Amino acid sequence: MAVLSVLLPITFLLSSVTGTPVTSPRQQSCNTVDEGYQCFSGVSHLWGQYSPYFSVDDESSLSEDVPDHCQVTFAQVLSRHGARYPTKSKSEKYAKLIKAVQHNATSFSGKYAFLKSYNYSLGADDLTPFGENQLVDSGIKFYQRYEELAKNVVPFIRASGSDRVIASGEKFIEGFQKAKLGDSKSKRGQPAPIVNVVITETEGFNNTLDHSLCTAFENSTTGDDAEDKFTAVFTPSIVERLEKDLPGTTLSSKEVVYLMDMCSFDTIALTRDGSRLSPFCALFTQEEWAQYDYLQSVSKYYGYGGGNPLGPAQGIGFANELIARLTKSPVKDHTTTNTTLDSNPATFPLNATLYADFSHDNTMTSVFFALGLYNTTEPLSQTSVQSTEETNGYSSARTVPFGARAYVEMMQCTDEKEPLVRVLVNDRVIPLQGCDADEYGRCKRDDFVEGLSFVTSGGNWGECFA
C-alpha cells in the first residue's frame, strides 16, 4: 500500500483550495453506504472518473423511491470497479514526473514543500483498500434497496476479466452477504453469491463488459483529439504559475494534468476511509478543479459516448443482454455478445430476478449512450467549461466515478397491467428516452424496448470493419 511521506493538516489543505476551513472528516460521517464519498466534496467531486462514487440523488426532481403501490420484480446493477491505483503506464509516468520535479526545482516553499521529500510508492492497476471498501458498501446498498427480492434469492453475477473488476465483484458479494445475514427476515440456508462468470479480456474475445472488438473505434483518435484541445485551453496559466513557484522546472500541459491526477490517486491510497486529503490537491484552485473535471467529461464523451460516432455502438451488446433479461427471451445480438456464453442457461440465465455485472468506466459510458440515457445532452464544448445543468446532468464524475453503479429496475404496480422499467445512475433517476416516461421517469417495458431501436437493430456496428 502506498505511503505518503508528508501529511499536511486537513484544514490547511482544503482552505488552500476553497479559501475556507473544513472540519476534519474524522469528526463527521462523510463516507457512507447511502451517500458515498462526501469528504472534501468541494474538490473530490471534481476528479472526473477518478472521483470516488458519490450519490447524486438530489440532482433530479424525480424521487428515487419506489412508489408504495409498486413492487420491484427485477433489478440489475452495472458497476464500475472500485478505486484503484494508477494503471501501470500512468504510474510510471507519474513517478518519472515527480522525480524530475525533485531533481530540477531549486526551491520548494509553502504548499510545495512536501514535494521535496515525497516518496512515490503507489502500486499499479489493482484496487486500493479504500476501493475494496467501496464495493463492500455497494453490495450492502444493493441488498438494502432491493431487500424484498434479495432476502429470498441469490443474484447472478458476472465480471470482466481484469483482477480489479473480479475483486470488485467479490467485495460486492461480501457486502451483500453481510447485509443478508444481518437481516432476520432473509431466507436461511441459501448459498452465498459467487462471481458466476468471468469474461476474459483477451483481445478479440467477445465481451459486453469490456470493449476491444470494433477496429475502427479502437483506432479512433476522436477522444484524444478533444482531450488535447481542451487541455490546451486551460493549462497554460497553470504551467506558468507552477514553473514560477517551482523555479528550475519545465512542465508540459500533459504533466500538469498528471499532477492533478495525483490528488485523487494519492488520496484514495492514503487511508482505507479516504479521511486524508493528498497535499497535491492544494496545488490547484477551485476554478482549476472545475476545469479538470470538465476535461475528464470531454474525454469520456468524445472517447466513448455520444461525441464519438462509434462510441454508443460499443454498448449495444450489453443493452441487448439487458433486453433479454427484462423480457426473459434469448439474446438477439451480432455485436459484442458471446454466443456460447449467452445461449447457455448456466452462464446466462433468463429466470433470475437479481443481476450484477462488473465492468470499466469506458464501456459503461458506451452502454449509457447506447441506452439513450443522455440523448438530451448536446455535444460538449471543447473550448469552455459547461455546467452539469448545461450538459443535462452528464459528467464523468456523475456517471462513471470509482465504484459507479447504475440500477435498472422493473416493477409491477397495482394501477398498471404491464411492468414498468426505470434507470438510476448513481441514485439519480434518468428519465427514459424513446418512450413515454411518466412522472417517476419510468416507461412500460415493451415501450422501453421498442424505443431502443438503435440497440435492437445493431446500430452502426457495421462501420466497425468498413
Curated annotation (Swiss-Prot):
Keyword Transmembrane helix attributed: no
UniProt-annotated location(s): Secreted
Keyword line: Disulfide bond, Glycoprotein, Hydrolase, Secreted, Signal
Annotated EC: 3.1.3.-, 3.1.3.8
Signal peptide (residue range): 1-19
Assembly and interaction partners: Monomer.
Cited function: Catalyzes the phosphate monoester hydrolysis of phytic acid (myo-inositol hexakisphosphate), which results in the stepwise formation of myo-inositol pentakis-, tetrakis-, tris-, bis-, and monophosphates, as well as the liberation of inorganic phosphate. Myo-inositol 2-monophosphate is the end product.
Official protein name in the record: Phytase A
Organism: Aspergillus oryzae (strain ATCC 42149 / RIB 40)
